[in-house]
Structure formats: C-alpha cells, structure tokens
Amino acid sequence: MSEILIRNIKRLVQVREPGIDRVAGNAMAELPAIENAFLYLKDGLIHSFGTMDELPSLPTSEVLDATGRFVFPSFVDSHTHLVFAASREEEFVMKIKGATYAEIAGKGGGILNSARKLQQTSEDELVERTLARAHEIIQTGTGAVEIKSGYGLTTRDELKMLRVAKRIGKETPLTVKTTFLGAHAIPAGISHEDYVRQVIEEMIPAVAEDKLADFIDVFCEEGFFTADETERIVEEGKRFGMQPRIHANQLHRSGGVQVGVKTNALSVDHLENIGAEEIEALKNSRVIPTALPGAAFFLGLSFPPARQLIEAGLPLAIASDYNPGSAPSGNMPLMVAFACIKMKMTPEEAINAATLNTSAALAIQHSHGSITKGKIANVYITKPMSSIAYLPYAFGSSLVDRVILNGKIYS
C-alpha cells in the first residue's frame, strides 16, 4: 500500500481519541481540530497526525499540500435508497401542483412506481445506474454508505436489489452496509396481512441464506406498516442476525420510535413528527435518532426538532435519505447546510451528526467517522476555506476538492 502525507493543513477536523463512538447533547457542539497540521496515511489507515512543528521524517509515496484548506473525515451516510431504476420527476411536478405524498401513492405513484420500474430492470442495468450515483456521492465527500432494498417488493427483486448493493461495495471504494427493507409498501395484488407474512416467512430467510443484509428496516407509518407489524418483522429479522433500524414518525406519530427503543434498534430515522413522549423514550436507550433533512425539505414537511433532541442529551445523526421520490440528493454537505439553516444546528453539531454519529448508526464507529489513529483512511480535502462554518454557509458551492478513500486518492 502507498503512503500519503498531507501537510500544511489549515485545520484538521474531527480529531478524536480511540474509544469515542458517538457524541451526544452539549458535547455535539465540540469539534476537536488541529491547526497547521499534517496527516499521515499508511496501508489504508490513519497512521499519525499532529502539528507541522511535530512532523517527523516519514517515508511517503505521495505528498499533498493543503495550505489554506481543511481536512475532514469522510461523511458516513447512514440512510439511503441508492439502488433504484429511474427518477420520478413527474411526481415532483405533481407535488408542485399541490398533490400530497399520500395522494401520489394512492394514484400508483410513490414507492409502487419505483417498484414497477425496478422489477423491469436487470441486475446489471441496476448496477450501472447505481454506480453512477455512488461515484456522485464520493465526489461530495461520502466514504461510507448504507443502502436499502425496498423497491423490489417481491422476494426475487428484493434479493436482486441487495445483490446490487453488495456489488457497489466491491466495485467502488465506498464502505457499504446493506439493509433489507421488504416492508416498505404493500404491493398490488396481495392483502396487507399476506404480505407481512411473506416478508416474515419467505423474504427474511431468503435474505439471510444469501447473507445479503446487515440490517432490517420497516416503514412504520399510517397506511404502510403498524407499530405491531414493525415489531413482528424486525424481531424476525433479529432472529436471522439482522439488526433493526426503523423509518419512524415521518408523516405521523406512528409509534415507530417506541418500537425502535423496544427492539433495541441501531437507529430510528426521519422523526419529523415527534414530541416529548418520543424524546423521553429515546433518552432511556442507545438508539441513535437520525434526521433526514433532505426529505423534509423536498416534501415541505416540518423538520425534526434538532434542538430539543440535543438539549435532551441525545446523539443526533444526519443522513441523506437519497431516493428518487422524496430526497433525490446524496450530497452530504447540503444535508449539513439544511441541518444548520432549517434545524438550527451549529456547524460543529451538524458535522458531528454526519460523521461520528452516523458511523455509530451503522455500527462502524470503530473504523469510520473521525480522524483517529487506526481508523480507515477516508478523508477529503476542501478547497481553500476561511472556517468550518463556511462549509454549510456556502451551501450551493462544491467545496470538496480531493477525496482519499482506503488510503488511495480517488479520481
């Protein structure tokens, strides 16, 4: 493996000692950094760092000068639907004209629209289309990503989606974690209870047999899956070795947060509709509350109450929800900007939420999410910037200049 020395870094950001796996509450406002720093990457890992005054003589195959630039750990995007067959901009226009999410779904749009398109698309075609999106998110600073199924809605097509996600992990330098989301919607031609039974009795064992999913997820929402159904499904997934994560409280007070706490989910995601009861439940758990500001922005929903979550001492995370219907962007710097502008998070809180806390939401906090000795060498170098706050402030600018993943310069 090659060695890379990055020198003259204006500010090396998110520098952590080993063992810090998440930051919560008031601690989210603290983002440790080193001024005028160097960072040495060796054998695909973070080897050492410090101030330029402390720079020893090091064997290097490549030296990068970062004068005037910041270096951050790569973003960890803990919630995406990166595998899909086609965009849905026709629904975007319907929304502009006043149609609601539920009305679009009722006319055969929404998730079922994506399912029809995906079922008609070959695995190789899906890989090709998803690869383009994977390289797009790498260029905006993402180094690790969760990818869900959920647009198959048949056993064959759910397995196809998860195989595609696994291939993205092999054919790109991204760290990929996979989630089985068969319980995303009820397909046409089958009763609600019969489909729940199919997910539990047929899909979960098939996914587990092929070792295709790290996690299991359910869209716990009115008109989709109840809290009781969500619990049944994720408990069966746990029996097959899949850790739960739950789509919770996006459109209504669905009970998803409480199910997530009860089933020891890694995360509960969305949270546009939560109150004191849900926050109190989260306070007594290790579940990571995850906001998806891109979806709230795109759908015109209320944003998750970030300040209340942080003031309750919780470790808030931020992910993109990249999908063709409600969040057609995997641009994590933009999500950080939305968190600051619309959720009133400070830049430091938002960066913590999109790196260390999302790594905890994927159970990869020991290898990703911070500048820590021994972690995987996933970092990006910015264009010249004046401060950390400039990243979300200049929300329309592309400020990621160079990306290094697994200790190799991405090009």
What are these regions (language model features)?
Residues R239-P244, K262-T263, G300-P384:
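His/Asp/Glu-enriched, well-ordered alpha-helical/loop segment
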Residues V23-M28, L356, I376-S411:
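C-terminal cap of metal-dependent C-N hydrolases
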Residues S114-R129, H135, G143-G255:
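Metal-coordinating catalytic core of metallo-dependent amide/deamination hydrolases
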Residues S61-E62, A66-R129:
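Metal-associated gating/positioning segment near the N- to mid-region
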Residues Y195-E209, G223-E311, A327-S329:
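Catalytic core of soluble alpha/beta enzymes
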Residues I9, L39, G44, G68, ...:
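Divalent metal-coordination and catalytic microenvironments
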Residues M1-S57:
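N-terminal metal-binding scaffold of metallo-dependent hydrolase/deaminase domains
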Residues L5, S61-D65, T178, V403:
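Conserved beta-strand scaffold positions in the cores of enzyme catalytic domains, especially
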